Amino acid sequence: MIKVGINGYGTIGKRVAEAVTLQDDMEIVGIVKTKPTYEMKGALDANYPVFASTKSKISFFEGYGIEVSGVTEDLVEIADIIIDCTPGKLGVNNMDMYKKAGTKAIWQGGEKHAPIGASFNSLTNY
């Protein structure tokens, strides 16, 4: 099974997670959130492990009774691939973390081609 981590479980991330769960050879090993929002219900209902974006946010989640499995770096270490669904201009900041861990990544947010070095658009690539 390919271990998939979703960094940014919001508008895009929750849809990516749904698509991953439909694959026979993939499993969600965790999702990252900056704060507990209404979108967390889907992650909790699906029993996705929840990771806080930073150590300072862990107590915020725990204050709402949400069990936290670690922080972003912890998820990056256990995942085979990270789908970065963070808002535009934030995802590129995670590139060094992914490279350092040797974890492959796909940016599914609003990143431009130049900093990432690759782009994909289903309209033009298929």
Language model segments and positions:
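N-terminal Rossmann-like NAD(P) cofactor-binding subdomain of oxidoreductases
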Residues: 1-126
